[in-house]
Every structure is written in C-alpha cells, then in structure tokens.
From Swiss-Prot:
Cofactor(s), by name: Mg(2+)
Biological process terms in GO annotation: aspartyl-tRNA aminoacylation
Name assigned to this protein: Aspartate--tRNA(Asp) ligase
Keywords: Aminoacyl-tRNA synthetase, ATP-binding, Cytoplasm, Ligase, Magnesium, Metal-binding, Nucleotide-binding, Protein biosynthesis
Residue segments, region Aspartate: 188-191
Source organism (scientific name): Thermoplasma volcanium (strain ATCC 51530 / DSM 4299 / JCM 9571 / NBRC 15438 / GSS1)
Length: 428
C-alpha cells in the first residue's frame, strides 16, 4: 500500500485503508483505548488503537518522537477536534527515540536561541519553526517564477574567486592548490561579464560570504543571495523588477502558507507597488526637520533610519546615494557625479537590499577604480569584458534570510537560517 501524507487524509473516504509514516508527537494510554498524535511534514492526525496486550506492551514504553509506520482506516465520524482520525490496526516502530529529548517539541517550555541552534535537528520539528522555512521556500519560489516570467535565465557563477567583488578586505581566504583564493562576497563581477556575453537578463540564487566581524540580529557571515543583472536598463528598471519580485514572493508565500502562518499568529498583507521613492538628500531634509545635523556623504545610523522609516508604511526606496558610499561599479549621475544611480530597498529602518545602474564605459570604469584606490591588476578578467561592447546594465542582490525575517516580523535573522554561520557559530 502506498504511503499517504497526513495532509492528504481529508481527500480520502471514510473507512479507506491508509498507511502513514511519521513521528510520535504525543501518546495517551487509557483503560480501553490508546490515542497517538502522529506528525509528518504536512501536519498531524490522531490515531486510535483499541488496547490489546500486544498494543499496550508496545506503546507503554514508546518514547515521544519515535518514528512509526501505522496502518489503519480513515474515520471521518471521529469526535476529535479535526473531525477526522485514523483507526489504527497495526504499528511498526521504525526507529525508537532516546529519552529525554534534548528539546521539547510540544511542551510549552521555551529554550533560548543558542540551545535551540545547538539542537537544531529537533528544533526544526516544531511546527512554528518549520513553518518559517516553508514560508521562506515559498518566497523564493515566487521570486523565481516572477523572474522566469520576465525572461531572466538562472545561472551559477563561481564561489571561489581570486579578487574581492567589493574591493574590500571582508573576505574568507581559502587555499586553492598553489594559489590564494577567497570565498565570493557576491556574484556581481560575473553577472556583469554575462551582460557583455549577451545573456541580457540573468539571476542567481546561491551562497554569499562576508568576513565581517559583526554579531547582530540582522547579519550572517554566510547567507543566500538572490541576484539579478539586466542589460539595456537603468536603476529605475531594476527597482521595478525588485518591487515586483518582492511582491510576487510574498504573494506566493501567503497563497501556499497563509493558513499555517495565521495559526502561529503571523498575519501578512501583500505590499502595494510601486514602493515609495525618496532621495538621499530628501532623507537629510527629514532628519534636519527633526533637529538633527547630518553631513552629506555619511551613512545613516540605525536611529536616523528609524526616523526616516516612520514616514513610510513598510517598503520604500532610498535613491541617489553619494558616490563615496557606493562600490566602484556604480554609475555616477550624469548631471551630478557626486551622487549615483543607485538605491537601497528599506523596510522601515531595516535595509533589505541594494542595487544600481552599473558603469558600462571602460574609461569611466578605470576612473572609478582609481578613485577607490583599487588594484586594477586583480580585476583584469573583469575589465576585459568592458572593452568589446558592454551594454548599459543594472541589477541588485537580495538576501533571502533577511527578507524572510522582515516579512514574518521576526527579531533575529538566525530564525530564518537552517544552520546559521555567524561570528561564533560554525557547528552544526
């Protein structure tokens, strides 16, 4: 008999034979009957056994979280809360759990995050925890489908590189045979090379690595980056793609996971597009109205972003950032080269992602290298692609974990990461 997922039991008829597999979440042995709560990735169901000597002997010493195979019949006349249960006929123990559990799965005992991450394998069995990753998967799938619908193709670029994408020192070194190499911060350089190759619209979903010694609730040293690059486009085109991608991801998450999220007290609405736009200089004026002094060329502090974010419902763009705050590949504004054709997507005070129109002229690119005091020799493979017909192009990179954290209203990015890598954690 083929396995039936618990979430599909309602599609069957009363008295249909079923075979379910999963974890024993809870167990109650009464005088004449035993009640089991079985769980698989799709949900839970109550299983009822009439007590026989064999059943009682098997169940009375069976620990929670043991893995079972149960055969029985659908009972749609059940008085259980769900109105459906399985009348058990046989049970096979596939794997017996040890006692005690390192973490409770259903008991209302709240472990701290460090303890949970140290025992992540069992923490992920909790419905409120696993629902985060179901939601994250749906967000990513919605974004992927949208990008495919817009003519983007998915690509995969190297994660072991010889040069820093951003030109900085925040890199993890690795030994690559006889050469020094690094884990890539971003697929930026390779995305741009593909514009020269004529691919025109590409996106990538993959790991990115930042050797930054921060230890905050919003940063990871390894994260999943969703990156796009598009030819014959500017920063405005990139913003339109980004806001629609974010909306599509949230929309798909609500369609696929809305019920589970509501059961966990998370209510989400689809954001309205277009997202509001405000320039960097307009942000300075907002701060000055609050009596704050701010110098052009400085980055905004968390407190300053909180003040700016109070003017917006949720998502908004800050545009036209100073050239001094942007990487070498960012296109300066034609009318005012002290600012750039760039943007940050914000959610209130939290930065979601950055993007820009890129430099496509090789002479301007070399000028930007010199302004940033970068070693041109390290980027020869990249510069070469600009000499033989590089089209105007733009793009962005979006951290999946941070987006999920923001959308679900969570307080720590580690909640949206299966096995976080931060300043102190490389296990498990």
């Amino acid at each position: 008999m083929p396995r039936v997922y618990i979430g599909s039991l309602r599609e069957l008829n009363h008295n249909d034979n079923v075979e379910i597999y999963g974890w024993l979440q809870d167990l109650k042995l009464l005088k004449n009957v035993s009640f089991l709560i079985m769980r698989d990735r799709t949900g839970t169901v109550q299983v009822t056994f009439k007590n026989t000597p064999d059943i009682v002997n098997l169940l009375k010493e069976l620990p929670r979280e043991s893995v079972l195979k149960i055969s029985g019949k659908i009972n749609k006349k059940s008085v259980s809360k769900s109105g459906l249960e399985v009348s058990g006929e046989s049970v096979e123990v596939l794997n017996r759990s040890e006692r005690p559990l390192p973490l409770p799965v259903i008991d209302p005992v709240q472990a701290d995050l460090e303890t949970r991450l140290n025992n992540r394998f069992i923490d992920l069995r909790k419905r409120d925890v696993s629902s985060i990753f179901n939601a994250e998967s749906s967000i990513l799938w919605g974004i992927r489908e949208f990008l495919h619908s817009q003519g983007f193709i998915e690509v995969h670029t190297p994660k072991i590189v010889a040069a820093a994408t951003e030109g900085g020192a925040d890199l993890f070194p690795v030994k690559y045979f006889e050469n020094d190499a690094y884990l890539n911060q971003s697929p930026q350089l390779y995305k741009e090379i593909l514009m020269s190759s004529g691919f025109e619209k590409v996106f990538e979903v993959g790991p990115a690595f930042r050797a930054e010694e921060h230890n905050t609730t919003r940063h990871l040293n390894e994260f999943t980056s969703i990156d796009i690059e598009m030819s014959f486009a500017d920063h405005n085109d990139a913003m339109r793609i980004l806001e629609n991608a974010v909306k599509s991801g949230i929309e798909n998450m609500i369609n696929e996971n809305g019920k589970d999220l509501q059961e966990n007290g998370i209510n989400i609405s689809i954001p309205e597009i277009p997202f509001p736009r405000i320039t960097y200089k307009e942000c300075i004026k907002l701060l000055e109205k609050e009596g704050l002094e701010f110098q052009f060329g400085n980055d905004f502090s968390p407190e300053e972003l909180r003040i700016i974010g109070r003017n917006f419902k949720d998502f908004y763009f800050i545009t036209e950032w100073p050239s001094s705050l942007r990487p070498f590949y960012t296109m300066p504004n034609r009318d005012d080269p002290t600012i750039t054709n760039s943007f940050d997507l914000q959610y209130r005070e939290v930065e979601v992602t950055s993007g820009a129109q890129r430099v496509h002229d090789p002479d301007l690119l070399l000028k930007r290298f010199n302004e940033k005091k970068l070693n041109i020799d390290s980027f020869k493979f990249y510069i070469q692609a600009f000499k033989y017909g590089m089209p105007p192009h733009a793009g962005w990179g979006l951290g999946l974990e941070r987006l999920t954290m923001i959308v679900l209203g969570l307080n720590n990015i580690r909640e949206t990461t299966l096995f976080p890598r931060d300043r102190t954690r490389i296990i498990p």
